[in-house]
């Protein structure tokens, strides 16, 4: 994709993001350099320590476009999945498939606590059978450790006047978007094996494979929407009551 084409796509994409935000008093949690580092570092730390080990787990890096989408959705103060992610070009100017995890708390928010809740679902997941315990959910865990997902963007927002579909009078929403999306039907989250087996030592860092193309064009980044679980079940929420 040329620079001119990329700019054109971005120009079409940005207004759709702005339309997601709702006016009203709320306390924004700034996307500072520290916030970004904590999100990326904690994701990579958890991805590098999966059990069984992963042969193809990609190192995650920050994506400003995914972060803008996550932030915009958190600012709507809605306790539900972002329907725009199911529409091509609405969630990101280049990636066609986007995964999403959401965490809501009425207590003190921290990136580490949110990811701790997501990764805790791993005890319910049977890798060899690629199944979750009956009537349980593991989709946030499997998205977090999805081997092919290598781009990440998160945003958080505090809603003092309440969150739609959240029982508490106020709370904080934390949203992370991933590309390409995980939780693709019939696929394991990653390939079991010795760390970095699929990428070799030249592309290995801390048991994670560095993706050789950090800025893929539209075609190489795309995955069919029909293969992605982008329903409410792929964005399961955890209530944390204090």
Regions found by a protein language model. Give the residues of each.
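Mature extracellular or exoplasmic CAP/SCP-family domains and secreted bioactive peptides
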Residues: 2-242
